[in-house]
Swiss-Prot record:
Organism: Meyerozyma guilliermondii (strain ATCC 6260 / CBS 566 / DSM 6381 / JCM 1539 / NBRC 10279 / NRRL Y-324)
Gene3D superfamilies (alphabetical): alpha/beta hydrolase
Subcellular location: Golgi apparatus, trans-Golgi network membrane
The protein's name: Pheromone-processing carboxypeptidase KEX1
GO MF term (any one): serine-type carboxypeptidase activity
Positions annotated with a glycan in the UniProt record: 61, 118, 434, 442
Topology of this chain in the membrane: Single-pass type I membrane protein
Organism phylogeny: Eukaryota, Fungi, Dikarya, Ascomycota, Saccharomycotina
């Protein structure tokens, strides 16, 4: 065990010594060297280099964003010089869902220890999970964000601070990935980056933004709400013969009237904000109509995040995914919070009710309005798990059909291409003019939760790391593309594929800003390398001496005679308490503790009230990343520092 730990420390030391620029000493306080189960459950070669902590953004209002960065110590060539920023949704749901249940290298077992996720995205590039807006997860502030433009401004500030700590990442290709309400966050952040790149201040260099990946995104909420009835009929869990069918159609018609009155291409802010309460009600009505009152109590409602699963009514998916019952207590272990370098320790809640209630998005236009301008410069990949109801693939394809970008409306043609991953059919792909859509088969609202290895290959579709054969798009397990027989494969090229399905089309960063970013960053990097050789050598020498000293001390300790009378442990027992583990959407006011050709169905949606949060069904359903918002009266403040956590079936204002 000791030598295992030393090996990890050496890997971290080499990572530091590789580029001792200005940020190196600063970032040392963010190292993560141990977590429960790390040395006993993970192969030593799979232990990532990790950095974690709370970065100060605005001292005037005490705003700090929490991040957890994972680096592959042995990266393959195709994954080098990449940084992926991952965001979960809500608003107000922690990206630790993504880190510990989806795209990160760890899962949490029943013993509250980490185990390895073989499909981790950190093998496709360094990945950084960020809790935002302020107040989400381990992030904190004295003030809350209210609008989507705030998200953009504050995240650009986070990037500024992040690159001060990790200057070697500044030249990397940047990708954003996330799901659910991140379908609003990511376009706004990308828009802010592109505007920054075009208006650089003295001494600034552009960020090399290369692609956006949005899974089960809540991008055009009202238009997507119109897909529920069609999806449910196709999936077979409702029919016109059901009681309440006419009520469902009436709800659908009211939403259609809203959509007809709002031009999604209109650049002005809609009276309906990001989502209309009228359209928000369609899903609530659908789940009520689909309820099977003759089934056992825990099987009466279809799971809104995976229609093949059942749940109790009115939860309808709030008790999913099952991993959450381990993730929450794990992140609330005091020792784990210390190992993650939390200066301001706080109870971890999956979703913050206070953030959701404050994030009203009342003056924000839906992110779908930003896609046309973004697609002029940046490739965007939208992917949907085909079993998701709340943000289903039918709704995504419907708003794309009505979208006008790069001089044309909708897709160039009707061609659909099968996507094969590792020799098996994984879904289908459509692509035109920098926009790619992927329907991922056999997956839910959280695609990486169900199919981690397959989901990681979505990065290959964005970066052009694929082949074409018989009008099929072929991707492979990490690093194995070169092993495939090339004689019977056609390389991805514009001329070989209709509908612009090609490596060039999918991976192109057509923006001159991206090219400029690469050139500028590389030039700056070249100037730094020579001047730091001596510093690197000295730093590595010091690290080696320190490690040798630790080894010598350990050897001396092991070799000395031991007494037959051994003292027992004297450490204090730490008592940790947390609320009902199945509660999906809890109030984060508890946070202010001590300073602390084939069809399927898919995608998750966030529900919202007049305050801008997406509410659960009947005002009582909590969405994983889009729960419904309850009236403020539902949240009773017990004290200035702690807000009462609602019981499992009470309404909540957050989603994941």
């Amino acid at each position: 065990m000791f030598f295992h730990a030393i090996l990890v420390l050496i890997q971290v030391a080499l990572a530091l010594g590789a580029s001792p620029r200005a940020g190196s000493s600063e970032r040392s306080k963010y190292f993560v060297t141990s977590l429960p189960g790390m040395y006993s459950n993970l192969p030593k070669e799979e232990i990532p280099i990790m950095f974690s902590g709370q970065l100060e953004l605005f001292p005037e209002n005490n705003t700090h964003y929490y991040f957890w960065k994972f680096v592959n110590p042995n990266p393959i060539a195709e994954a080098e010089r990449r940084t992926i920023f991952w965001l979960n949704g809500g608003p107000g749901c922690s990206s630790m869902d993504g880190a510990l249940m989806e795209a990160g290298p760890f899962r949490v077992n029943d013993d509250k220890e980490i185990v390895y996720n073989n499909g981790s995205w950190h093998k496709a590039g360094d990945i950084v999970f960020v809790d935002q807006p302020a107040g989400t997860g381990f992030s904190y502030s004295d003030e809350y964000e209210h609008e989507l433009p705030d998200v953009s401004v504050h995240f650009l500030k986070f990037l500024e601070k992040y690159f001060e700590v990790f200057p070697e990442d500044r030249q990397n290709q940047i990708f954003f990935a996330g799901e659910s309400y991140a379908g609003q966050y990511i376009p706004y952040i990308a828009d802010g980056i592109l505007k920054r790149n075009k208006n650089l201040k003295a001494g600034e260099s552009p960020y090399d933004l290369r692609g956006l990946l949005i899974g089960n995104g809540w991008i055009a909420p009202n238009e997507q709400s119109l897909s529920y009835v069609q999806y449910a009929l196709q999936a077979g869990f409702v029919s016109p013969s059901m009681p309440g069918w006419s009520r469902l159609l009436a709800s659908q018609e009211r939403c259609q009237n809203v959509v007809n009155s709002v031009n999604t291409q209109d650049d002005s802010v809609s009276d309906y904000k990001v989502v209309s309460d009228v359209c928000d009600q369609v899903l609530n009505t659908l789940l009520e109509v689909a309820r099977d009152r003759d089934a056992p109590a825990d099987q009466q409602c279809v799971n809104m995040y995976d229609y093949t699963l059942r749940d109790e009514f009115p939860s309808c998916g709030m008790n999913w995914p099952p991993d959450l019952v381990n993730v929450k207590p794990f992140l609330n272990i005091p020792g784990v919070q210390s190992q993650l370098n939390l200066v301001h320790k706080k109870p971890w809640l999956e979703c913050s009710g206070r953030v959701g209630r404050n994030f009203v998005a009342q003056r924000s236009k839906p992110a779908v309005h930003l896609l046309p301008s973004l697609l002029e410069d940046v490739p965007i990949l939208l992917f949907n798990g085909n079993r998701d109801i709340i943000c289903n693939y039918i709704g995504t394809e419907a708003f794309i059909k009505e979208l006008e970008w790069n001089g044309q409306k909708g897709w160039d043609d009707d061609n659909v291409f099968d996507w094969n991953f590792d020799g098996n059919l994984a879904g289908y792909v459509r692509n035109s003019r920098n926009l790619t859509f992927v329907n991922v088969f056999n997956s839910s609202h959280m695609v990486p939760f169900d199919l981690p290895d397959t989901s990681r290959s979505l990065m290959d579709l964005v970066t052009g790391n694929f082949d074409i054969k018989d009008d099929k798009i072929l991707t492979y397990k990490l690093g194995t593309r070169g092993q495939a027989k090339q004689s019977d494969k056609k390389p991805a090229s514009t001329s070989s594929i209709p509908s612009e399905i090609s490596a060039t089309a999918l991976a192109s960063g057509s923006s001159s800003a991206s090219a400029q970013a690469s050139a500028t960053a590389n030039e700056a990097d070249g100037d730094n390398n020579t001047s730091h050789k001596i510093e690197r050598a000295i730093q590595l020498l010091v690290i080696i001496v320190l490690l040798w000293g630790i080894y010598a001390l350990y050897s001396s300790y092991k070799s000395r005679p031991s007494s037959i009378i051994k003292s027992g442990p004297t450490g204090k027992k730490k008592n940790v308490q947390w609320a009902d583990q199945l509660r999906r959407f809890q109030e984060d006011d508890q946070v202010r503790v001590q300073p602390h050709g084939i069809f399927a169905k898919a995608l998750n949606k966030f529900k919202g009230n007049s305050d801008g949060a997406y509410a659960p069904v009947q005002g009582r359903y909590e969405d994983i990343e889009m729960s419904s918002a309850s009236p403020i009266d539902d949240f009773v403040v017990v004290s200035d520092d702690e807000e009462e956590e609602p019981s499992r079936n009470e309404p909540s204002s957050n989603q994941k």
